[in-house]
Amino acid sequence: MINFEAIIGIEVHVVLNTATKMFSPAPNQAQNATPNQFINAIDLGLPGTMPQVNEQAVQKALILADALNMQRVQPVLVFDRKHYFYQDLPKGFQITQQNFPIAQNGYVEIVENNKAQRIIIERFHLEEDTAKQHFVDGQILLDFNRCGAPLIEVVTAPVIKSAKQSKAYLQKLRQILIVNNISNAKLEDGSMRSDCNVSVRLKGQTAFGTKVEIKNINSLNNVEKAIDLEIARQVKALIKGEPVQQVTLTYDDKTNTNVFMRKKDNSVDYRYFIEPNIMSSNIDELLQKPNKAFNLTEFFTKLKEAGVNEQLNQLVVDDLTLFNAYTKINSVINSPQDTIRWLCIELMGQLNKLQKPLKDKTIDHLIILIQMVQKGTVNQKQAKQLIELMLDNGQDPQSLAKLHNLEQITDEKQLTQIIQQIFKENEGEILKNLDRVERIQKLIIGQVMQRTHNRANPQQVFIIVEKLLHDFSERAS
């Protein structure tokens, strides 16, 4: 790559997590649904149907426009028909925004080698998804649950220079989509799909090389691998003087290779024209609503200031369910460090081990548990035991702590009696070691914890031991 440079542009299709589809009242619930359970005559393009724009989808698009620093937002909503024949497109056309995309001219900021880099976003637009194809025994089976689902297609300028930059951009975009509740943004289930257009040219050359598209990559790590493979292939071809063909590839993670899908043809005429069944509509009212995006940079700064390490910072914005849980818990706990520690490490560690999902009831129970730890009702070891019990039978931590005798002993009178008894039993040992205070403290505290089965509050025990030891020393002298 000494004399060559890569030029990469990325198109990302994002499935919005709205309640209904883009142009119909059908539920937007393609994931884990029975095939063809959520279909509507509008999405199938049956005669006499009239599409209606999903206002929630438009609202999410406006929030994304703020998050991606888009300089131009279209005040009038206009849709076009994109005509082509394929079995997953029952109408024979897709409703999209070719000529008047809802937002243009923005950027996403990434960090590379401790330096901020801007990835230019040319445009993004709203459109509808197609049906999902299943290839079974030589047949193509169609599931129309996904047909008509609301999409946003985000298109970068061809400014990305490496596979590493591509991964960083997609990771940042994904985090933006998650924290703003725009999409679940999971590559593995298709709610975020990226097409990477890769070309290579000699350094100093102004014309672009031949563009090769890589589709259907199911993870961020695989995006990096697929692009690196394609850059290396094109460099090798150019060194040999061989032409690079304009083709579409897909990445096979089992063999770590890019596999040929089809030849690419730029001459396809989609016969775009304005969608006649959707009136152009002014969205000034929607533009006046609060469309302020969540400030991800500020969020990371606050976590860093709270002492949360970068790995955990990234983890909490990696999943919409987890981020929503964090937001709910921290609004009560008001401690990012405690929230992330007990949610991301302790609770999610157990849930992943048990292969159980995170439920609202569990989140409510975790809030109570963290409060119990903060008040000293239970110690950290007891709290971990309570998490296991909570997930086992679904009871709240307060009831479980009483039932299983897992509450800390915090009663000063009770602890003082226990410690005084230990002083009496070890009077000779204490007298011999009055000049070795730490040793005596360790001895007494150890016995207190043993007798209380680790239920005594260590901080309170230490304070009482210190006071009684001081009194004992004065009497002995």
From Swiss-Prot:
* One MF term in the entry's GO annotations: asparaginyl-tRNA synthase (glutamine-hydrolyzing) activity
Name the Gene Ontology biological process terms: glutaminyl-tRNAGln biosynthesis via transamidation; translation
Catalyzed reactions: L-glutamyl-tRNA(Gln) + L-glutamine + ATP + H2O = L-glutaminyl-tRNA(Gln) + L-glutamate + ADP + phosphate + H(+); L-aspartyl-tRNA(Asn) + L-glutamine + ATP + H2O = L-asparaginyl-tRNA(Asn) + L-glutamate + ADP + phosphate + 2 H(+)
Q: Does the keyword Protein transport apply?
A: no
Q: What class of enzyme is it?
A: ligase
EC code(s) of this entry: 6.3.5.-
Gene3D superfamilies noted in UniProt: 1.10.10.410
Q: Which UniProt keywords apply?
A: ATP-binding, Ligase, Nucleotide-binding, Protein biosynthesis
Quote the subunit structure annotation: Heterotrimer of A, B and C subunits.
HAMAP family named in the record: GatB
User: Which protein family is it in?
Assistant: Belongs to the GatB/GatE family. GatB subfamily.
**What exactly does this protein do?**
Allows the formation of correctly charged Asn-tRNA(Asn) or Gln-tRNA(Gln) through the transamidation of misacylated Asp-tRNA(Asn) or Glu-tRNA(Gln) in organisms which lack either or both of asparaginyl-tRNA or glutaminyl-tRNA synthetases. The reaction takes place in the presence of glutamine and ATP through an activated phospho-Asp-tRNA(Asn) or phospho-Glu-tRNA(Gln).
Name of the protein: Aspartyl/glutamyl-tRNA(Asn/Gln) amidotransferase subunit B
The gene designation is gatB
